[in-house]
Amino acid sequence: MQNLDPQELEKFEKMAKSWWDPNGDFKPIHQLNPTRLQYIQQQANGLTEKKVLDVGCGGGILSEAMAKQGAIVTGIDMTVAPLEVARLHAKEQGLVIDYQQITVEEFLQKQTALYAEKFDVITCMEMLEHVPDPLSIIQSCRALLKPNGVLFFSTINHTFKAWALVVLGAEYILKMLPKGTHDYDKFIKPAELLHWTDQANLVCKNICGYHYNLLTGKFWLNQDVSANYMATFQHKSI
């Protein structure tokens, strides 16, 4: 059985046409992208000529940003329309990105069957809260990571504050996101993420929260992980 939720996929299929509209359904992701890209670059010591796997790449906003920094990017997702949008936009930008419609578990099986390809950097951003089995995603990412590679996850804490900001605020009051984009029951506490990553033999190197400024339309990072947060992991042996 594939580790996906058809209802979650349907949400993003419907929003595919607006993926690259900076004022559309994915405006918050466009606003967040410079901040998370800078974080990834800092934690990974740059991206130039590094092999990167973007898990749950959607329409390719982060994939393209990393490719523009010199990374060799593979983007995987299970949605159809967003991947087509991603391929077309990358072509228009003159970027070479390998987009594939496949789950990370299936991608791992394919890599194992063909050859043991590993990645310097793996990103899985704003995805874990949309799948039935986050641990399976984490374990597959770990298996695809080079011994000295860096793995990134971002998700949403399971707190009242997160619900108030992400669901009530962003979806219903400010209408920054379509209603129903997020399911509070699927939000993930940092302790849960750290438990799963420990099971996958990963160690957390950094964790931080990211927050939105309504006046500037920009995000900033700090140590408050009570709502949105992202973290850096490596193999425990590192």
UniProtKB/Swiss-Prot annotation:
Pathway: Cofactor biosynthesis; ubiquinone biosynthesis. It comes from the Bacteria. Keywords: Methyltransferase, S-adenosyl-L-methionine, Transferase, Ubiquinone biosynthesis. Pfam families: Methyltransf_23. Its EC number is 2.1.1.222, 2.1.1.64. GO terms for molecular function: 2-polyprenyl-6-hydroxyphenol methylase activity; 3-demethylubiquinol 3-O-methyltransferase activity; polyprenyldihydroxybenzoate methyltransferase activity. GO terms for biological process: methylation. S-adenosyl-L-methionine binds at R36, G56, D77, M125. InterPro entries: SAM-dependent_MTases_sf, UbiG_MeTrfase. SUPFAM superfamilies: S-adenosyl-L-methionine-dependent methyltransferases. It is an enzyme of class 2 (transferase). It catalyses: a 3-demethylubiquinol + S-adenosyl-L-methionine = a ubiquinol + S-adenosyl-L-homocysteine + H(+); a 3-(all-trans-polyprenyl)benzene-1,2-diol + S-adenosyl-L-methionine = a 2-methoxy-6-(all-trans-polyprenyl)phenol + S-adenosyl-L-homocysteine + H(+). O-methyltransferase that catalyzes the 2 O-methylation steps in the ubiquinone biosynthetic pathway. Belongs to the methyltransferase superfamily. UbiG/COQ3 family. This is Ubiquinone biosynthesis O-methyltransferase. It comes from Histophilus somni (strain 129Pt) (Haemophilus somnus). The lineage of its organism: Bacteria, Pseudomonadati, Pseudomonadota, Gammaproteobacteria, Pasteurellales.
